[in-house]
Amino acid sequence: MDPIAECATAVAPAAYCGRWTDMWNRLLPAAEVVAADCRVYFGRTRQTARPTTPLGPHELQSVIDAIRQRLPGIRYRFDSLTRYQPDSNTSGMITLLWNVAVPGQGTKTGIDLLRHEGARITGAWSITGDLELPFMR
């Protein structure tokens, strides 16, 4: 059974972060991670042709695929120390620090805010920095 479906409360923020990161690493399709009406807001200039604010899993998957095509070997990971603010027993906001490494191009760090409802991400705000920052301890 899906660990998020079993425990969609404050106990499971790392599971959401893991699925979100796996999606960016193309280990899970966006259709298994985000809701049909999920919007993703990026806080940086586009690096690939993409919608300004992708809507739903199909558009988000297209963004992920375009990035992976342009930057082969790109790898995302997140800091295991996440922050969680519940709205209810089945929804809340997760804050995570992440970094992305591109072979031959170094590492960048970012912050994502993920809103979830049940087992799906319903909204995301993603900010990428130009410098690598240390993870929180």
Language-model region placement:
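C-terminal and inter-domain tail/linker signature
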Residues: M1-R137
